[in-house]
Amino acid sequence: MKIALDVMGGDHAPEAHVEAAIKAVKAFPDLTITLVGNEEEIRPLLPANDPRLPILHTTEKIEDTDQPTTAVRRKKDSSMVLAVREVKEGRADAVISSGNTGALMTAGLLYVGRIQGIDRPALAPMLPTLDEKGFLLLDVGANMDGKPEHLLQYAIMGNTYMEMVRGIKQPRVGLLNVGTEAGKGNELTKAAFPLLEAGPFHFIGNVEARELLNGACDVVVCDGFSGNLVLKSVEGTAGSMFSLLKRELTKTFISKLAVALLKGRFKEIKQVMSYSEYGGASLFGLKAPVIKAHGSSVASSVYHTIAQAYEMVNQQVTTIIKTEVAKATKGSEEKGE
């Protein structure tokens, strides 16, 4: 198995990416990782000339400030585009990047392409829950608007991922809504509800945003606009809460002593709400795994993203998604007749 890793994207590139790759090839004996980036920066970070860590040299990079479509078309020798093209040309089974999200989605669509039967891809991160199991949220911005049939496809893809990669039997699939009653919501959610109810997965109905971190379900589907709001709210709330705790608990000498005694516990609490161990956000609906690692990913987070990509390839997630979507499409057509 071979994974292409863009080592020029993200806040901690290339050190975090190379460190993670070294750890990953030790953990997975059949894995080769192509490090795509500036060889002058990468080579000193490698312990030796490991044949399982080849370098694809380039000095061109897509910046976070670049316009996605323009950057992908003009910067054809950028580390991100070259990494994605490794998949297109059959030299890699999956690709990972911590760079410009929009550019990665554009490159994935342009070079990897959609699975037949998938109308719109979905960007899907795992978010933390209090029970430490996490939940998959899709879409969080690949498409701002959605149609009912898109949400059905998101549910099929999310269900497949949670079963095959996260090992959850009969994942609970929920529809993000403003209330739990079947008749709640806007035109999109009202039309999507019966499609999801008849889908080939365990649909539990509508779920409210306030219940997500409590582990209300394993897969949450919504349009990209709503999903992005949830994603940013969760990230922002977690950060604000820890800042508040730090401020309030360091006001007095006594409270500072208490913090010192409970430092380990606070670290554990922070870890519960961290996304790092869940890997990156998969761009579901493409012919091969294309995964966006968080821009601030450190080595441990990049490593978990590599492990995520490895499992997706190993479990043939894209093949199963293609089969399940084809079944659902055929079933809908037969009912329409």
Curated annotation (Swiss-Prot):
Signal peptide: none annotated. This is Phosphate acyltransferase. The keyword Iron does not apply. Pathway: Lipid metabolism; phospholipid metabolism. GO terms for molecular function: phosphate:acyl-[acyl carrier protein] acyltransferase activity. It is found in: Cytoplasm. PANTHER family: FATTY ACID/PHOSPHOLIPID SYNTHESIS PROTEIN PLSX, PHOSPHATE ACYLTRANSFERASE. Homodimer. Probably interacts with PlsY. The keyword Cytoplasm applies. Its EC number is 2.3.1.274. Its main location: cytoplasm. InterPro entries: FA_synthesis, Phospholipid_synth_PlsX-like. Keywords: Cytoplasm, Lipid biosynthesis, Lipid metabolism, Phospholipid biosynthesis, Phospholipid metabolism, Transferase. SUPFAM superfamilies: Isocitrate/Isopropylmalate dehydrogenase-like. It catalyses: a fatty acyl-[ACP] + phosphate = an acyl phosphate + holo-[ACP]. GO terms for biological process: fatty acid biosynthetic process; phospholipid biosynthetic process. One of its GO terms (cellular component) is cytoplasm. Catalyzes the reversible formation of acyl-phosphate (acyl-PO(4)) from acyl-[acyl-carrier-protein] (acyl-ACP). This enzyme utilizes acyl-ACP as fatty acyl donor, but not acyl-CoA. Belongs to the PlsX family.
